[in-house]
């Protein structure tokens, strides 16, 4: 509470400043009104020129906002209110603008997006789902295109070429997951041409609380298949029903964890025929057991997932939508598949990962909008250094929030809900009902059918018509049953949403705001005017009936989600009403103090169908929600603390990759690598005693696997001068450097000038990627078991940092060692490549061999133990270029390796948060957009489609 007050200390001054900015913009309105369309459009070029000449965006703000407001008025027929000007200015200043539902956040976003696009560095507008990204890019994009800016949208099914084009636009709309995955894919790319993003300048996050708070518990992960037997999942799915809750294992529903008791462990050990489940060799079995029990107790069919066509399909617990192609992580999905007896699909290995917190902290400037941010102001400030500015409403709030009604049973609660809906419908008042699952929404729908109440159901099974249903949810007599967050981002306007109804009418006529822009814009005003008259007449009737009635059938674990549901009513000063119906069987009530309330109701002999309203119940609910919010915040803080370790390492690797991709000359870096590796070899061999104690044969055997050694150890020992460690190192280093100079002359002579520099680039990139993937796997494994350190009175986070640091440096040493070995030993030749019409040409190809050569095996062993030199006997020839790992490209005539084949594309999976914090995993087929490549034919088709689209514009 104290922190919240401190954070709001300067709020009044900032609001005064924002009001002054809005007043200044209003003073410019008459001048802007007098401009023709062409003159208004020319203002954009003028602003760009002035900014290039040194004028700051802050100085341009009043004029740019005035121009953008007029652009919106001419294209959309909507003029920004003063509070929207204030909200836009707050966003430009890098703040979170808290604007209530219906205050026009989407329109507000146009102002700072337009202003910051003038800098020419790209503005990213982040939304919660693909539908909203496309809608806003089409809808608000009309304003930007009218003013001469380009607008792009990132969709999940786009090719890399389409993504690159969208990012090249002045303003790009997309979801947080797509922006984050593109960043990760860019850092897996093999050439700059494969990268799609162009930096991180300014991001405006719509529904910022949802994206930066709720979804921040789940990191973004790109993974590929890992070898894993499905036998153990089936085995533990067989064993789980044998164990009884509270006897063999305990379940903590609040933390969503399970713990096996001694009796449970004994049963498992007997069934598996093992002596100790917790000994090191059996550690993986504990994970299978925990997942099997979680699948049994915490993941319910038709609530958390459904089984369709032999597949387990996740249902988003917050929106009720089916999440096709998405999978739970860490073996959880496989455990559920085993439980349901369907095909068990392979687990994955992490290839790249980042948390949303660290992704959004890449931006030079970050801002956000939401209707409910004040409760999380401290976290926004602590994690993102973002202040929260409550923007006043355009008109006073007139919604009546009724007290909660608590029933003893769920059946009685839903009967009361159905009766309330029937009563409101009979008088014509529109009703929006919020449920927590598909199952409950369908149960309520059946009750309404029995009562003869016509209604629309908005859940996972019917989400295709989501926008249309929500747009009409404010019409007279409308009854809409929706899962909690469905339709977020679409205003429920009394009488109907004019813009959506007009857009639907024009689309019925075959017109699209992008493909048929001119015809669409020409017909828009007349259609809007016609629909506006009809809507306004109906809206007046609805206002007299009391406005939109929002009815919640259960409290959410977060107060913000409850407030978001309530916020659908009472927009722009309209009347409205809200009420929550609860039962003692609700999940939140069960998790906290429901037994106490039930005891009171039983003592008072309260019938099942009679609700209670009491301060004690209200306090219990508020206390429960506060506890869950605190738990979730701790989880997010913990995720961030652990990812900070990875973030430092990721920055080093990604910066190095970028330098390699941008063509930095690696000659000096490679020379340092040679010196470091040779020095490590010599130091390891000469650590003890004097020259007569050193194992020269072992050292020379190792050095020969690294490079062609020309100096003899016998000659050094037999020389007149005493052989010291320093002299030995000096001689070997001189020999290695001479060998590398000879190697460079050989490669350049065989292929052409500069070939060695290109070989260095490809080898370093290849080894870097493979070592980073291996390191991610090791770090995942470390994190899984690090919690056990607490039992030894050690801080798991401190241990994770320390061991992660050691592992990272070991990985860098192994990277140097393998890179040097490849550069000396890889076979190259000059030859014309075979025609490859489906593959782009790039300077060098590097691909993974099916079986590692002895040299490669020895390199891997040496990397595993830094203190010892363990090298295999050298072969007569080094590995072919085709044996370098990680290639994704075809070699040109300049430089090729023997036996080079085009590598197969890897099937990737993308794991990230759902709209409200659940976990989703999307699978892609090999060769689809996610791997960052496309065939030449696909690129040509995409280019033709883009050219046609541009021509129509």
Swiss-Prot record:
Chief site of localization: membrane
Biased composition regions of type Low complexity, renumbered to the chain: 841-865
Membrane topology type: Peripheral membrane protein
GO cellular component, one term: cytosol
InterPro entries assigned to the protein according to its UniProt record, in alphabetical order: Helicase_ATP-bd (IPR014001), Helicase_C-like (IPR001650), P-loop_NTPase (IPR027417), SecA (IPR000185), SecA_CS (IPR020937), SecA_DEAD (IPR011115), SecA_motor_DEAD (IPR014018), SecA_preprotein_X-link_dom (IPR011130)
Keyword 4Fe-4S attributed: no
Segments of skewed composition (Basic and acidic residues): 898-907, 940-953
GO molecular function, one term: ATP binding
UniProt-recorded name of the protein: Protein translocase subunit SecA
Organism: Saccharopolyspora erythraea (strain ATCC 11635 / DSM 40517 / JCM 4748 / NBRC 13426 / NCIMB 8594 / NRRL 2338)
């Amino acid at each position: 509470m104290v922190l919240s007050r401190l954070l709001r200390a300067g709020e009044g001054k900032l609001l005064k400043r924002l009001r002054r900015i809005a007043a200044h913009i209003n003073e410019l309105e008459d001048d802007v009104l007098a401009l023709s369309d062409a003159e208004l459009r020319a203002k954009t070029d003028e602003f760009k020129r002035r900014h290039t000449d040194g004028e700051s965006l802050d100085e341009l703000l009043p004029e740019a906002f005035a121009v953008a407001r007029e652009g919106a008025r001419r294209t959309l027929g909507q003029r920004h209110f003063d509070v929207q000007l204030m909200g836009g200015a707050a966003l430009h200043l890098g703040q979170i603008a808290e604007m209530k539902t219906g205050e026009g956040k989407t329109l507000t976003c146009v102002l700072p997006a337009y202003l910051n696009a003038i800098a020419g560095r790209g503005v990213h507008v982040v939304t919660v789902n693909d539908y909203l990204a496309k809608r806003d890019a089409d809808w608000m994009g009309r304003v930007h295109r009218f003013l001469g800016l380009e607008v792009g949208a990132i969709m999940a099914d786009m090719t890399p070429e389409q993504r690159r084009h969208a990012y090249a636009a002045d303003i790009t709309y997309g979801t947080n997951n797509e922006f984050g995955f593109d960043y990760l894919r860019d850092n897996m790319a093999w050439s700059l041409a494969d990268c799609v993003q162009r930096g991180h300048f300014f991001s405006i996050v719509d529904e910022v609380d949802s994206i930066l708070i709720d979804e921040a518990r789940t990191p973004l992960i790109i993974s590929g298949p890992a070898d894993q037997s499905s036998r153990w999942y089936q085995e533990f799915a067989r064993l789980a029903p044998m164990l009884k809750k509270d006897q063999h294992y305990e379940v903590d529903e609040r933390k969503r964890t399970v713990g096996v008791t001694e009796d449970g462990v004994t049963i498992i050990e007997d069934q598996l025929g093992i002596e100790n489940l917790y000994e090191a060799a059996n550690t993986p079995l504990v994970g299978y057991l925990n997942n099997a029990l979680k699948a049994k107790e915490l993941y319910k069919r038709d609530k958390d997932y459904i089984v369709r066509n032999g597949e387990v399909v996740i249902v988003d617990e917050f929106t009720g939508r089916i999440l096709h192609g998405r999978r739970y992580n860490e073996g959880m999905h496989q455990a559920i598949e085993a439980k349901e007896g369907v095909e068990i699909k392979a687990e994955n290995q992490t290839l790249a990962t980042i948390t949303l917190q660290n992704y959004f902290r890449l931006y030079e400037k970050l801002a956000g909008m939401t209707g409910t941010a004040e409760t999380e102001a401290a976290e926004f400030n602590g994690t993102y250094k973002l202040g929260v500015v409550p923007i006043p409403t355009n008109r006073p709030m007139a919604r009546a929030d009724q007290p909660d009604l608590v029933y003893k049973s769920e059946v009685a609660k839903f009967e009361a809900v159905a009766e309330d809906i029937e009563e409101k419908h009979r008088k014509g008042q529109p009703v929006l009902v919020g449920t927590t699952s598909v199952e409950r929404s369908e149960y309520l729908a059946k009750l309404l059918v029995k009562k003869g109440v016509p209604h629309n159901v908005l859940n996972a099974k019917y989400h295709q018509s989501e926008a249309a249903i929500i747009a009409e949810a404010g019409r007279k007599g409308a009854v809409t049953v929706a899962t909690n967050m469905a339709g977020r981002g679409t205003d429920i306007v009394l009488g109907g949403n004019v813009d959506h109804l007009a857009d639907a009418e024009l689309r019925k006529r075959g017109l699209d705001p992008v493909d048929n822009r001119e015809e669409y814009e020409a017909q828009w005003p007349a259609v809007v005017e016609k629909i506006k008259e009809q809507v306004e007449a109906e809206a007046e009737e609805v206002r007299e009936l009391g406005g939109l009635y929002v009815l919640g059938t259960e409290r959410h674990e977060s107060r913000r989600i409850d407030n978001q549901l309530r916020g659908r009513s009472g927009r722009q000063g309209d009347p409205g009403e809200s009420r929550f119906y609860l039962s003692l069987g609700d999940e939140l009530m069960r998790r906290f103090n429901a037994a106490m309330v039930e005891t009171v109701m039983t003592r008072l002999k309260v019938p099942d169908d009679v609700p209670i309203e009491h301060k004690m119940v209200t306090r219990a609910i508020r206390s429960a929600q506060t506890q869950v919010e605190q738990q979730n915040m701790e989880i997010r803080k913990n995720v961030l603390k652990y990812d900070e370790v990875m973030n430092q390492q990721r920055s080093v690797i990604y910066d190095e990759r970028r330098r390699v991709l941008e063509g930095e000359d690696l000659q000096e870096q490679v020379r340092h690598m040679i010196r470091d590796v040779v020095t490590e070899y010599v130091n390891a061999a000469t650590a003890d005693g004097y020259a007569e104690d050193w194992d020269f044969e072992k050292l020379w055997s190792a050095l020969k696997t690294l490079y062609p050694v020309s100096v003899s150890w016998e000659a050094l020992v037999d020389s007149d001068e005493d052989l010291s460690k320093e002299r030995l190192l000096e001689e070997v280093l001189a020999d290695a450097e001479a060998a590398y100079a000879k190697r460079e002359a050989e490669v350049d002579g065989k292929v052409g000038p500069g070939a060695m520099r290109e070989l260095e680039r490809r080898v370093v990139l290849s080894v870097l990627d493979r070592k980073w993937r291996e390191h991610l796997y090791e770090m995942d494994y470390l994190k899984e078991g690090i919690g056990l350190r607490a039992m030894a009175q050690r801080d798991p986070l401190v241990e994770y940092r320390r061991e992660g640091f050691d592992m990272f440096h070991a990985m860098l040493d192994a990277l140097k060692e393998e890179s040097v070995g490849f550069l000396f030993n890889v076979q190259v030749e000059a030859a014309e490549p075979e025609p490859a019409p489906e593959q782009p040409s790039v300077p060098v190809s590097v691909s993974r061999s099916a079986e590692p050569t002895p040299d490669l095996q020895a390199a891997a062993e040496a990397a595993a133990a830094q203190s010892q030199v363990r090298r295999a006997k050298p072969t007569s020839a080094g590995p072919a270029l085709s044996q370098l790992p990680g290639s994704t490209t075809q070699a040109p005539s300049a430089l090729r390796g023997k036996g080079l084949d085009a590598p197969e594309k890897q099937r990737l999976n993308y794991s990230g948060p759902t709209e409200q914090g659940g976990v989703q995993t999307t699978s892609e087929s090999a060769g689809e957009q996610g791997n960052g490549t496309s065939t030449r034919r696909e690129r040509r088709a995409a280019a033709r489609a883009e050219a046609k689209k541009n021509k129509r514009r």
